[in-house]
Amino acid sequence: VAPVYPARALSRGLEGFVDLSFTVTTAGTVKDPIVLQSTSSLFERAAVRAVLKFKYKPRVVDGVPVEVPGVKTRISFMLED
């Protein structure tokens, strides 16, 4: 799921990234996203919204799906030439 480029960042020609940490649930959805680092606060809300739409295959231990905390990802915001 691609994030929506924030209008203020777009109008200013800003590029950047947001590093996030979150938990993957037993259903493969994302919960509790936390911003670890970002180049601009303008990107944080868009990155959190995008990561909440991510879907994962749940981790299975002994035939039972388990939550996976501490998953990390970087969402990049780059302007096209």
How would you name each of these model-derived features?
Residues T25-A27:
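Flexible loop/coil segments at beta-strand boundaries within sensory signal-transduction domains
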Residues L20, V30, V35-E44:
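Short glycine/proline-centered loop/turn elements that form peptide/ligand docking sites
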